């Protein structure tokens, strides 16, 4: 199963911010979109999410074109999305945040939903926090609950917008472990865009680097991390994984 973008173009006024970008994400792999500020990576990412419509080009999931589908239909097709902004329901408890999504999951029986709740609480290390109001969580705890809640919908793919933003180094390590686990053990495809290239490249299988609206470098993350052009224009000459 694959998400594929073909020849995406986005123009605002007289400026082409995304220029003919094509890429893909398969189930079971972690892929990232990277680039300097203003390069077009976020706009490219949002065209996969469904927040931005391209001027031209197409987006497919499992061979079905979804270019003009709204986000709710993309979710039903198996695409989960975690925004950078705080998306947790602050007045609800941790378990009620997850239950809310589980109750809408038509793929699971009542008993399966109960088991899934316990599984997600345990997997993301928040069982002891299950009765806590979400407003009382730290940044790292909140992010783990948000990922668990997104997984409650049983997606095939997860699109993560700035998953490492606003959390401390220890929490970043925990989130990295969670991302690898959902890819390797659950078989989900994961697409990440983030301003932390070291954390992102260290857990991704493949990377696309965008300059001036165009994908200029792509390949295995370890190769991209050592690419001289990527270091010159984005990563910095002393960058190391």
Each PLM stretch: what is its role?
Residues 154:
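Conserved catalytic motifs of ABC-family nucleotide-binding domains
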Residues 34-36:
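The feature captures the beta-strand-to-loop junction immediately N-terminal to the Walker
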Residues 49:
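Helix-to-loop junction immediately C-terminal to a conserved catalytic motif
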Residues 3, 18-20:
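Conserved structural motif at the start of ABC-family nucleotide-binding domains
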């Amino acid at each position: 199963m694959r998400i594929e973008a073909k020849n995406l173009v986005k123009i605002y006024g007289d400026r082409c911010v995304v220029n003919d970008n094509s890429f893909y994400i398969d189930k079971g792999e972690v892929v990232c979109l990277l680039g300097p500020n203003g390069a077009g990576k976020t706009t490219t990412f949002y065209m996969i999410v469904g927040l931005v419509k391209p001027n031209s080009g197409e987006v497919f999931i499992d061979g079905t074109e979804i270019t003009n589908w709204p986000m709710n239909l993309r979710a039903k097709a198996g695409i989960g999305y975690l925004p950078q902004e705080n998306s947790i329901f602050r007045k609800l408890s941790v378990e009620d945040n997850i239950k809310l999504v589980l109750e809408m999951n038509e793929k699971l029986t009542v008993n399966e939903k109960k088991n899934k709740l316990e599984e997600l609480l345990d997997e993301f290390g928040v069982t002891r926090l299950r009765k806590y109001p979400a407003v009382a969580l730290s940044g790292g705890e909140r992010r783990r609950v948000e990922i668990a809640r997104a997984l409650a919908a049983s997606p095939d793919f997860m699109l993560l917008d700035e998953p490492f933003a606003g959390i401390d180094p220890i929490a970043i390590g925990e989130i990295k472990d969670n991302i690898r686990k959902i890819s390797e053990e659950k078989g989900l495809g994961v697409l990440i865009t983030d301003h932390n290239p070291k954390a992102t490249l260290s857990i991704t299988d493949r990377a696309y680097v965008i300059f001036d609206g165009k994908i200029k470098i792509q390949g295995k993350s370890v190769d991209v991390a050592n690419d001289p052009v990527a270091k010159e224009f984005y990563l910095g000459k002393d960058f190391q994984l």
